[in-house]
Amino acid sequence: MADAPEITCPDPITVSAGSGVGAAVSYALPESRKGQGAVSVVCTPSPGSTFPVGVTQTQCVATDTLSRTASCSFSVTIVAPPRLRATRIMAFGDSLTVGQTILSNDPYDFVAPPGTSYPAVLGQLLSARYTDQTITVFNRGLIGEQAWRAMPRFIDAFVTDRPDVVVLQEGYNDYRVGETPAIGVANAVLGISELAREARRRGARVFICTLAPGRPGRVQIPAWALEDINAQYRRIARDEGAVLVDLYAVLAPDVNAYVSIDGLHLTLLGYRRVAETVFAAIRAELEIR
């Protein structure tokens, strides 16, 4: 008579779920050894079953023709998809939020290819990670807008979009059209401060972006003005309890790749880098752990 059957279960299995319900898990039935005659192997839950989020112990039993059995078990862990505390995100700003760029050698040939603005790419990144939620990113960019004049439009957009999160990125135009450089800096700082305060008052989590660097040789805003504005944006973020997204620090190391030939607007790669940076900031601040 043959020895009693033996069975060895597979190693623990971990699967990421596409939704909070669970996930179907397929696995190979353990192979039995020894035993009399044909040995059957049955596992519960069976391969292909839907396992709930969490840890499930799977029991496997081998039975030979003499009804002798051997058993083993292994764990199946279903990891719930990540979730975000916010699902409605309003990107508010100027032409860099619109996504204007230059694809030719003409520094005045501005275009905004569909799906390439940072809010559009941000939406793609968020949707790919938070598969169990519907994340909406509203692009509320306006070409040529000055931050200190933006409040009426901001309020209208906020009432319409009802965002949980507001991302602010503007201030270039305030400096460029200011009566003096000092007034331009002051207007940018005033505008972002008021917008951040209003967004917080209305219950949104606020993210403030520093201004991107200019391209060497074509910089339209002097380095001192950028440094001054960005330093005050950092202060505003602290004072208003906002999250600072330091785009200047991220884009400066490879400015020729990220900034268009006009020295102000970003390249398609630059907008993707902005989206990745804002995505990382939102994930760090708002992902449920």
Stretches with model-predicted labels:
Residues 80-140, 156-162:
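Serine-esterase "nucleophile elbow" of acetyl-processing enzymes
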